[in-house]
């Protein structure tokens, strides 16, 4: 994807007379690609093993993917194109073939090794010879050399166990009277982006451009506190308590109590140093340079981040208080976070959109600092800590007064992006869902209408239309359209909101997935894919127009 010449691939080549389609096995993250011609038919079923062991608290999730080739009709013919390019194609790929597997690694990093197992002759795969499918076959690509026999019986066992895992997982999800399939698919996406330790990725790709040919290409394979908190809160509200519990443990294990050690994002294993590197030897997706790995945003001050986290902490511990030691650990973390917020809310920051220029006083950042202190005061109230409750509540009041004074612009009849400009920003729509402003407040109504008039174009939303470090944004930001739909709904424009939501659903890909951005004209998916932001917002918006189907909650 990131270089058509140097990039790796692992695919099937068939004659032009085949029709190709894809779908998920219902209620799972198992993907089936179907190849159909007049005389022949076969399917490639892709899945990553995932299932509970005899100890239900542990899950088997190796770093590997099975490709089960199922013969359906006739004698299908195809070639397998297997050309891995490990370590971002920075070195030459070395192939080592044994009687069991094809091992590959890069001369630039020999520790990163892949092992391809198959029931098909390995030399036919390496030489890209035509294969005649007479029976079911399989491929297994693993990052580990297997220590038990790999055969088709093992593959079928892994498939069945994985199928049961996903069916059980979706069975624990709340069911809705309308849009249930759409909600379920988005939740399955969020689940796939959750690591076993509780961390949640913003997306699973790097450097897919926000606009073709431009430089807004970022590595999203990290855990932002903001994105992860929003994702986990969505999963939590839909019935997946364990996801929230794991994330809380991740946050508590990653954080320490010194103010100067907090970051707005971490590596998936809690890594703190996420140095950004440009891979100049790669041409980029559709020649959109640069290709980046790492993300220097980890240095940034983004004052809004702790608002989302504190909202989740409050919701979680209000409903799932946990053990005494867990609550005490949480309380120490809350005090440390809010010490941070009390100091930093007055400072300019980089904001939710992570500008790389000079920091500004973003209204949405101030609002989320209010959220952090408001939720902290509520937690203090739950724990009978009146001194902290009073201190944080008073500071939250100061922030709200500050925003109302400096963020509301009479000449615009709207809140503005920053204290120092008169631009509009879709993140202002978050003032209502987080409780900063009442949906009946005329200032919110006017802000929603102003944002819609300025930023909505062809059924899609800009984040903002002001110049930033890279010029003017030129693509739609998917989550912002969902934010607008909610805002219209809560101010009473429910029919308009529903119509816009239905239109938005047509912009997903053939599997119901959304990326970060969408091209206004062509509706092409742009940016990193799939995007947690987009799918959590889709779920939160869809349930506005539905209700829980309690008939399906009985077991």
Where are the model-predicted features located?
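Acidic, mature catalytic/reactive cores of soluble proteins
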Residues: 1-555
């Amino acid at each position: 994807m990131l270089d058509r010449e140097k990039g790796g691939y692992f695919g099937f080549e068939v004659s032009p007379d085949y029709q190709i389609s894809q779908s998920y096995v219902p209620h799972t993250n198992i993907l089936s690609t179907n190849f159909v011609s007049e005389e022949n038919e076969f399917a490639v079923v892709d899945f990553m093993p995932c299932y509970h062991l005899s100890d239900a608290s542990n899950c088997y999730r190796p770093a590997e993917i099975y490709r089960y080739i199922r013969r359906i009709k006739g004698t299908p013919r195809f070639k397998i194109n297997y050309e891995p390019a490990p370590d971002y194609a920075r070195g030459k790929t070395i192939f080592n073939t044994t009687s069991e597997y094809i091992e590959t690694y890069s001369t630039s990093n020999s520790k990163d090794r892949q092992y391809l197992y198959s029931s098909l002759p390995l030399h036919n795969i390496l030489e890209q010879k035509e294969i005649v499918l007479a029976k079911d076959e399989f491929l297994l690509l693993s990052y580990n050399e297997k220590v038990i026999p790999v055969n088709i019986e093992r593959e079928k066992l892994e498939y069945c166990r994985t199928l049961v895992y996903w069916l059980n997982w979706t069975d624990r999800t709340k069911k809705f009277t309308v849009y249930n399939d759409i909600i379920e698919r988005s939740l399955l996406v969020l689940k796939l982006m959750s690591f076993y330790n509780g961390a949640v990725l913003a997306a699973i790709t790097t450097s897919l451009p926000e606009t073709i040919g431009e430089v807004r290409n970022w590595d999203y394979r990290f855990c932002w506190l903001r994105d992860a908190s929003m994702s986990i809160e969505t999963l939590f509200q839909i019935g997946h308590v364990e996801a929230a519990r794991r994330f809380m443990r991740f946050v508590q294990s990653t954080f320490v109590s010194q103010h100067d050690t907090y970051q707005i994002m971490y590596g998936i294993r809690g890594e703190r140093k996420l140095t950004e590197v440009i891979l100049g030897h790669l041409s980029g997706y559709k020649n959109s340079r640069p290709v980046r790995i790492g993300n220097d945003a980890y240095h940034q001050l983004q004052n809004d981040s702790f608002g989302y986290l504190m909202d989740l902490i409050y919701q979680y511990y209000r409903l799932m208080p946990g053990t005494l030691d867990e609550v005490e650990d949480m309380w120490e973390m809350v005090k440390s976070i809010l010490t941070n917020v009390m100091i930093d809310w007055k400072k300019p920051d980089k904001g939710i959109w992570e500008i790389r220029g000079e920091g500004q006083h973003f209204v949405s950042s101030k609002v989320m600092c209010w959220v952090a202190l408001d939720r902290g005061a509520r937690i203090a109230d739950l724990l009978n800590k009146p001194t902290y409750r009073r201190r944080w509540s008073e500071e939250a009041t100061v922030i709200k007064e500050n925003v109302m004074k400096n963020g509301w612009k009479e000449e615009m009849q709207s809140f503005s992006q920053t204290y120092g400009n008169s631009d509009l920003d879709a993140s202002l729509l978050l003032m209502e869902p987080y409780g900063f402003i009442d949906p009946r407040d005329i200032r919110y109504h006017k802000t929603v209408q102003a944002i819609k008039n300025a930023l909505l174009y062809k059924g899609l939303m800009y984040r903002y239309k002001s110049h930033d470090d890279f010029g003017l944004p030129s693509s739609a930001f998917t989550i912002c359209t969902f934010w607008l739909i909610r805002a219209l709904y809560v101010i009473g424009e429910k029919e308009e909101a529903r119509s816009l939501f239905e239109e938005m659903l047509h912009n997903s890909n053939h599997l119901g997935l959304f990326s970060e951005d969408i091209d206004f004209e062509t509706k092409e998916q742009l940016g990193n894919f799939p995007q947690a932001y987009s799918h959590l917002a889709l779920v939160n918006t869809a349930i506005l127009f539905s209700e829980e189907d309690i008939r399906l909650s009985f077991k």
